[in-house]
Amino acid sequence: MSDSTTHYDLIVIGGGPIGLSTAWQAARRGGRRVLVLERYGFMNERGGTSGAERHWRLQYTERDIFALTLEALPMWRELESLTGRKLLHEVGSLWFGDTEVKTNEGQISGTARAMDALDVPYEWLTAREIERRYGFTGLPAHYEGFLQRDGGAIDVRGTVGAVFQLSQQHGAVLRGNERVLAVDPDPDGVTVRTEERTYRSDKVVLTNGAHANELVEAWGSKLDVGLYELPLVTLRQRRAEPGRPFWFAFQQPTEEDTNLFYGFPPNPWSTSDDIRLGPVFEVDALAHADDAKGVPAPRPVERVTDWATAHMPWTDPRPAELSTCLAMLPGNPARQFFLGDAGALVDGGENVVVSVAGWGFKFTPLWGKICADLALDGTTAYDIGRHALVPSESSGIVA
C-alpha cells in the first residue's frame, strides 16, 4: 500500500459515540482525510455503550461542567435535525435522597445551588411529595430532592447510528475489526500500527475507552482509572403509569458499596413498558476490559431488587432480563473525565488528543467538536481545564 493511501489528516481510534462524533465534526469541515479505527464492529455493545438508554441531564454540581451541558443541548438539537430522529427524551430528571452526600453523580444540595446560579428551573420536593407523586414507598423522612424537567433519557442506539451516518456522509473512512497495537507520536505527526497495516497521520484522537491505557502505557504513562462491570436490571411493571421520570437515589454508602441506585421509566422510543434499574457501585474493579463477562454478579443484582421491593410497589422485582455495562471512571472523581492533548505525556503528544472515561454519553456531540477542535486547530473555546492530562512527575500517572 502506498504512502498516499495510508496517510490521513486525522485518525480516530475507537468507533463509539465520541469517536464517531469526532469524525463527523472533523470531516464536515471538508478537505481533510479522516479515518476511524474500531477494534470490534461498529455499533457493538462490548464496551461502555451497551444498553438502550443513558441519563440526559443539564444539572451538575460543578459549574464548569454544568456550563458544558448547556453548550451541548443545541448540538443535540442539530444532531436530531440532521438525522430526522429524536434522541433526547425529556421525561424529567429526579434526584432525591440525602441532600448532603457527595457521590460521583454529584451532590443534591450543591447542584441546587448551581441551578440557582445558572437560572436553570427545578422543583424542590420532600420525601412525602415524591412518594405521592411518583409512587415510591418507605423513603426515609429526611430525604429531599428536585425534579429538573428538561432531563430524561438519551436513545443510545439512535445516537450511535446518527453519528455513524453523519461521519460516513461527510466522507470519513470507517474501518471495523481492526485493532490498534501502537500509537507513536513525534513532533511531525503520529504513526499508528494495527494488526493489519501501518498508518501515518498528522493528528490522532484516542476515544477507545477501556482500552486506552494499552496504548498510553507504551509512552511511560498511565491514566488512573477504575473499570467496573455494572449490572443493568430490567423489571416488569405491575401497573404502568405514564409520567414517571428518570430517578437517582443519593444515599449514604454502606460498608459493602456506595448504595447508589438509579432507574429509567419505559423508553419513549420503545413499545415495551419494562423499566431498567442499576446500581452505581465502584467495587470489584476489573484488571482489564477483556475480563468483563457480560453477566452481572448476583449480589449487586440482589441489592437492586431489594431496593425495588422496598420502595417501588408498582414493579415486579423479579428480573425480566439481566445485562451489564462497562464503566471506566477516573480514580480522582473531581476530574470527571480525561479530555485534552497528550503533550505532557510523551514527545510529540501535542499531536494526540485523548477523550476517555467518565459518564460522558450526554456530551457526545460536544466532545466530538472539542476533540476535532483540539486536533485540527490546537485549541478549543470550551473550558476543559479540569479534565487535562497532567501526569505526576514521579510516577507518570495521570490522576
Predicted regions and their residues:
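N-terminal Rossmann-fold NAD(P) dinucleotide-binding loop
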Residues: G19-L20
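Active-site substrate-recognition segment that forms the wall
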Residues: W24-R28, G84-E90, N208-E350
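Dinucleotide-binding Rossmann-like beta1-alpha1 core, especially the glycine-rich loop
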Residues: E53-R133, L260-F261
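C-terminal catalytic lobe of FAD-dependent flavoproteins
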Residues: T309-A399
